[in-house]
Amino acid sequence: MAHQKILILDFGSQVTQLIARRVREQQVYCEIHPFDVSDDFVREFAPAGVILSGGPNSVYEAVGWHAPQSVFELGVPVLGICYGMQTMAQQLGGSVESSGKREFGYAEIRARGHSELFRSIEDRTNDEGHGLLDVWMSHGDKVTALPPGFKVIASNESCPVAGMADEVRKFYAVQFHPEVTHTIKGRDMLARFVHEICGCGRDWNMPDYVNEAIEKVRAQVGQEEVILGLSGGVDSSVVAALLHRAIGEQLTCVFVDNGLLRLNEAEQVMLTFARNLGVKVIHVDATEQFMGHLKGVSDPEAKRKIIGREFVEVFQAEANKLPNAKWLAQGTIYPDVIESAGSKTGKAHTIKSHHNVGGLPETLNLKLLEPLRELFKDEVRELGIALGLPHEMVYRHPFPGPGLGVRILGEVKQEFAELLRRADAIFIDELRAADWYDKTSQAFAVFLPVKSVGVMGDGRTYEYVVALRAVETQDFMTAHWAELPHSLLGKVSNRIINEVRGINRVVYDISGKPPATIEWE
């Protein structure tokens, strides 16, 4: 199916992905590409509209950091955001200068000039009846002269041109960021742009995308066999369900139990995929192999490397038993692709692999199949539901690739893994029972390799400590510790201490990100 598309050109903003997510939320397909794509690429992409992102540079200093001229010659609407507004102004004959000081944070602007972009969109009105908008600014330059044909559509004292438009050509630009949640009516503005100004319908949704994705896989794979490293995480689980629906017996999954999984995770994966869905799954219990190589190792990075290396070894051994497999499937998702886009945006040039298959040797000689590479995480979850996966599996909290290996501080021992598994399961059970699981973005227990004195009954105990961690976040770039009810924390602590022999103290981590990271290692 040919979707109407929005082209987003990335000038290096930290929040460019948010633009794409907001557009996709409107059920409109879009793609992010580096700003320096060729004119031919822009024409062949055939967008219904173009969005120019923000960026860290100044248009009068960054030589060559401008949009392809074809963007303004296609005859389609264009929206410039922050730096995107400045390059639009400069390229079309206006002027941009330094503001003298950066404007960062909340700002109130007045909508002016009866623009189509802002029509009936306001947070409130002033005494004269003019529409006012609460927006988020992040800029050090400003437009000082409009290009021919443009008018001011938004302003405030510190930013006389907070928005501009050429309504005839449908070129719009704003100095603020409509994609961030701090701009209260930002979603409404982007919806107005893609639906009413660009004329896009709502033809991008996961239930309808299932058949399209299945056809893509069948066309790519044909009659050849595929191997997938199934971890039990959201991405690989959705890939497994999609490929099984598309190619059935041509798919073989390899599930490696490294001894660092959550409680009953191996059983749940086998039940869901092998027994309920009928997927061909090879279950490899490599606990002893992993634990043996982790013995005596305390450094977090060293542990990660060992766990990754041993996974590769186990997976390769199983792959060698499947000589007919021609494809390696991975759970690469769209943010991975964006982050590896490279170009002058200064982003990494190496594709970031799915954590379980990272570093698989090229000697496998397998072609790469990445059926989720166009999807954001929320879309992957929606696709999983559309494919019939259980809600509890699809909406599970993130789990690190090395598993409990980086939630056991210091040396990893099987005994520690068992204690942590049970404590973590109690925490998650109680969060679910209290309807707090879906209110938190990530929650887990951490094993601390220290002992503390306690009293149980009439006896003294000297046992281990577990820390509980729960955070709320929209993007995992920053996070706030979840303010769980004290009664809930008390119940979790009481259960862990009474039910998990070997733990006599439970603490709660109230660190935000920054300065702390979400995971402890």
UniProtKB/Swiss-Prot annotation:
State the protein's name: GMP synthase [glutamine-hydrolyzing]
Its annotated function is as follows: Catalyzes the synthesis of GMP from XMP.
Q: Which GO terms describe its cellular component?
A: cytosol
Give every GMPS ATP-PPase domain span.
Answer: 204-396
Active site per database record: 82, 177, 179
Q: Which organism is it from?
A: Aromatoleum aromaticum (strain DSM 19018 / LMG 30748 / EbN1)
Q: In which pathway does it act?
A: Purine metabolism; GMP biosynthesis; GMP from XMP (L-Gln route): step 1/1
Q: Gene3D superfamilies this protein is in?
A: 3.30.300.10, 3.40.50.880, HUPs
Among InterPro entries, the record links this protein to:
Class_I_gatase-like, GATASE, GMP_synth_C, GMP_synth_GATase, GMP_synthase, GMPS_ATP_PPase_dom, NAD/GMP_synthase, Rossmann-like_a/b/a_fold
Catalytic activity annotated for this protein? XMP + L-glutamine + ATP + H2O = GMP + L-glutamate + AMP + diphosphate + 2 H(+)
Q: Which residues participate in ATP binding?
A: 231-237
Glutamine amidotransferase type-1 domain location is: 5-203
What keywords are annotated for this sequence in UniProt?
ATP-binding, Glutamine amidotransferase, GMP biosynthesis, Ligase, Nucleotide-binding, Purine biosynthesis
* One Pfam family per UniProt: GMP_synt_C
Q: What is annotated about its quaternary structure and interactions?
A: Homodimer.
Q: What is its EC number?
A: 6.3.5.2
> Which GO molecular function, any one, fits this protein according to its record?
ATP binding
Tell me which positions the record assigns to the signal sequence.
none
